[in-house]
């Protein structure tokens, strides 16, 4: 092809391109997606926020919902702080944040609870084991229980019970020992009528007695058929277990099993021996 023919072909191509019309802007806008908004521009956003709020509210309600036994436990502990004063359901709901007015099963559990007194009209109060409020009440109660009273049970009666027990111990109006099953004290009355006068000679003899060490005392008790208190024995075993920790053994894996019993010194002649 000569130069004149090439130029003619090029001009035809340019004319063909110019004959093709570009799509107008109106055509593009016709295919543009425009979401339909009903009821104003802000209603869609408001509805979306409302649905999110509703979902979050329901989720929070499900998380905060507690089982019935936990609700009753919280209510019993709250009533205990009132020291026998009755409380209605409104006060209970306000103080415990548990909505129980629309839960008849919770009210039924409260009525049948042995630690709660039902006063009627949805009014409840805590029922302690001992009805005491002062130090004098404690001193009057103790003679009726020769086996002693647990301080934890006495503390259910009123908030300052443990403080009053401590004061009675300091003034030696009561005696206290540790319970074998727990760390709680058992208190007894200090009855002056049970005091027996002793001679100074007998007191000196008592003080001169030397107690054996703990190991010998335990052996002598076992020889006499007496058992050691479980709490003391278990504590001693726990302490000895901590002191006697076994040392971990290092596990070595043998890889060259084909020469496991091979000793390279077997064929080496010893010093002073004749060569083979």
UniProtKB/Swiss-Prot annotation:
InterPro entries: TFA2_E-tether, TFA2_Winged_2, TFIIE-bsu, TFIIE_bsu_DNA-bd. GO terms for molecular function: DNA binding. Pfam families: TFA2_E-tether (PF22254), TFA2_Winged_2 (PF18121), TFIIE_beta (PF02186). Residues 256-276 are annotated as: Disordered. CDD domains: TFIIE_beta_winged_helix. Residues 62-133 bind DNA. The keyword DNA-binding applies. Recruits TFIIH to the initiation complex and stimulates the RNA polymerase II C-terminal domain kinase and DNA-dependent ATPase activities of TFIIH. Both TFIIH and TFIIE are required for promoter clearance by RNA polymerase. This is General transcription factor IIE subunit 2. It comes from Dictyostelium discoideum (Social amoeba). The lineage of its organism: Eukaryota, Amoebozoa, Evosea, Eumycetozoa, Dictyostelia.
């Amino acid at each position: 092809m000569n130069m004149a023919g090439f130029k003619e072909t090029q001009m035809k191509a340019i004319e063909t391109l110019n004959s093709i019309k570009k799509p107008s802007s109106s055509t593009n806008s016709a295919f543009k997606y425009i979401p339909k908004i009903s009821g104003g521009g802000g209603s869609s956003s408001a509805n979306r926020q409302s649905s999110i709020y509703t979902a979050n509210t329901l989720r929070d309600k499900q998380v905060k919902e507690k089982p019935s036994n936990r609700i009753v436990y919280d209510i019993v502990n709250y009533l205990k702080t009132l020291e026998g004063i009755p409380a209605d359901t409104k006060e209970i709901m306000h103080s415990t944040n548990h909505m129980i007015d629309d839960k008849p099963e919770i009210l039924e559990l409260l009525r049948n609870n042995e630690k709660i007194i039902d006063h009627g009209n949805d009014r409840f109060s805590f029922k302690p084991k001992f009805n005491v409020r002062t130090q004098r009440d404690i001193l009057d109660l103790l003679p009726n229980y020769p086996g002693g009273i647990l301080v934890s049970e006495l503390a259910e009666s009123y908030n300052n019970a443990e403080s009053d027990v401590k004061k009675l111990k300091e003034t030696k109006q009561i005696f206290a020992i540790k319970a074998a099953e727990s760390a709680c004290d058992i208190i007894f009355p200090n009855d002056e009528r049970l005091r027996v006068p002793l001679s100074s000679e007998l007191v000196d003899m008592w003080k001169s007695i030397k107690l054996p060490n703990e190991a010998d005392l335990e052996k002598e008790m076992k020889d006499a058929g007496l058992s050691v208190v479980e709490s003391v024995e278990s504590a001693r075993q726990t302490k000895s277990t901590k002191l006697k920790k076994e040392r971990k053994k290092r596990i070595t894996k043998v890889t060259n099993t084909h020469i496991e019993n091979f000793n390279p010194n077997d064929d080496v002649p010893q010093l002073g021996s004749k060569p083979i």
